[in-house]
Design a protein with these regions (language model features):
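Short, charge-dense linear interaction motifs
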Residues: 1-223
Length: 223
């Protein structure tokens, strides 16, 4: 019995696209000799940060507050002597309109006892770019199979299998799409007004890989 010849190929594609969102992390801190006053001061500064972020309206996609903490400061060389208390909080802001990013970071950096880290550029988890990359990888696999078949005077006739990388051989863990999220700047608050910071969105690399197996017509072998 003659087995119909097959072709196993890997399709892959890398897309370079603009980011869809930018994430900025804002650390808020307060220090006082009294624990209650330290917490009250933290609450006041945290509220100011939240108000500044929310004032940007639709440009901000999401605002999230992290857990707050307060701990005593001990005098050097002692275990029990408390000299004051430090309270900390964190706010994470996700921005979709990058035109407000510079003003927001510069404004936040001007707040007392506030540290700004970011932005981190990325795509949304449900970004259509990810689907586009997967489809392009599948199309690349088909094109490769056709080229290989054509080299032997044959044509592709049927798709047998299409799978994430490694699954055809039950080997590697699948890894279809990932996005490179790069580009970060840091701005730490000072009492003086900060110069306006400029941010250039960093392109995101989205890579998709698929394995495929096709059947083809009988090859024409010379010689």
């Amino acid at each position: 019995m003659v087995t119909q010849p097959s072709i196993s190929v890997r399709g892959e594609v890398t897309l370079e696209v603009d980011p869809e969102i930018a994430v900025v992390s804002i650390a808020v801190m307060a220090r006082d000799k009294d624990r209650r006053r330290a917490l009250d001061l933290l609450a006041k500064r945290n509220a100011a940060v939240l108000a500044m972020a929310r004032a940007l309206g639709d440009a901000v996609e999401k605002v999230e507050s992290g857990a707050a903490s307060v701990h005593p400061e001990l005098k050097d060389g002692t275990k029990e002597r408390v000299t004051g208390y430090v309270a900390r909080g964190n706010v994470t802001v996700t921005i979709s309109d990058f035109t407000v990013l510079s003003d927001m970071v510069t404004g936040l950096a001007g707040e007392e006892m506030v540290a700004v880290t970011g932005p981190w550029w990325s795509l949304r988890p449900d970004s259509p770019v990810r689907r586009r990359a997967r489809v392009s990888a599948a199309q690349d696999a088909l094109q490769r199979a056709r080229e290989y078949a054509d080299a032997f005077g044959a044509t592709v006739t049927e798709l047998v299998q299409l799978a994430d990388p490694g699954l055809l051989a039950d080997a590697d863990r699948p890894q279809i799409v990932h996005a490179r999220t790069a580009g970060r700047a840091e701005a730490f608050a000072t009492a003086a007004a900060a110069e306006e910071l400029e941010f250039e969105p960093v392109k995101q690399s989205v890579r998709a890989v698929v394995d495929a197996r096709f059947l083809m017509t009988a090859p024409t072998l010379g010689g």
